[in-house]
Amino acid sequence: MRFEEFKYVRKGVIVGLLIMLLYIIWPFIDVLAYSCAFAYMALPVYNILRKKFNKTISAGLAISIYILPIMTITIYALLTFMEIILSFNTKSIEPYINEILSIYNSFMLERIINNEQIIAKYIDEFIKYLVSQFSGKIIDVGYLIVKVIMVLFLTFYFLRDGDKAKNLIISFVPDEYKEKMRIYLSYLHDSYKNLFISCVSLSIIITILSYIGYLILGVPYAELFAIITGIFALLPILGGWMVYISIAIYFFLIHDYTKAVFMFIYGELFLSIAPDFVIRPYLVKKEVDIHPVLVVIAFLMAPLSLGLSGFAIGPLVVGALNAFYLAKYRDKKI
């Protein structure tokens, strides 16, 4: 075999292996996306810790500091949601339930009672359904736990060894395109920092600040209102102001003017002015600011299309395209 022929065979083998690798990791593409997202979100904390600790300790501490508040807020929200469900007053809908049951009894129940085989059949099918659903949920929970563990490990390694990824990618690029790839990766890094640090991290900070404010005022279900405020803060036009202004109006309507004024001032200072004019400029560069339409696509359309994985995959895709546009067409550097 001549050298030229061997080169084509080698390239074919490499392409085949890459396709096989893609096939293996495709079911876990959401794990990779979330790991990348969490790594960027924890990057500011990692950079601060890196001044005093080595890479391994800094990455571990950054993950702990960043993920613990998220887990705490999520657990609070779930417990609050369960409390709302358990405290639901069923007496208000009892007349409707009784009416439905009476109609059902008059048409169906007498025929079913007269046929014991039908009763046994329905009971058997119901038990099989419960068993299949329960076993399926156990498998789903186990699968989810495995994915969460994988996200934690991959986030750790992305933080610790992320700087090596750039050199690894450039090493696969032909020499004449290495400089352009270097420029594009720089834009990509800034674009992801803007999306994940500016948008997502800012949303988490607003969630925590709003939770503190709602607790001080004694707002019922403060955890849920704080999470809603953080989610609204992600979206253009809407914003977290819709939540705290509504709460202020509520206090005003019940003649609790002190709380209404406090909610308005606290919301304006800590949930609007401070995030936009103090925290956001500190986190990201203005030159790579993301257009509001792209934010909607990344954080609203992508989750609606792809499910929960869209919260991570959407920003990754939008960030990559935005970086290409900025480098290629706006600044004409590649």
Swiss-Prot record:
Membrane-spanning segments: 13-33, 61-81, 138-158, 191-211, 234-254, 259-279, 293-313
Membrane topology per record: Multi-pass membrane protein
PANTHER family listed in its UniProt record: TRANSMEMBRANE PROTEIN, TRANSPORT PROTEIN MJ1177-RELATED
UniProt keyword Transport present: yes
Cellular compartments per GO CC: plasma membrane
Record's signal peptide: none
Family per similarity comment: Belongs to the autoinducer-2 exporter (AI-2E) (TC 2.A.86) family.
Pfam family, one: AI-2E_transport
Origin species: Methanocaldococcus jannaschii (strain ATCC 43067 / DSM 2661 / JAL-1 / JCM 10045 / NBRC 100440) (Methanococcus jannaschii)
The protein's name in its UniProt record: Putative transport protein MJ1177
Keywords: Cell membrane, Membrane, Transmembrane, Transmembrane helix, Transport
Record's subcellular location: Cell membrane
Upper taxonomic lineage: Archaea, Methanobacteriati, Methanobacteriota, Methanomada group, Methanococci
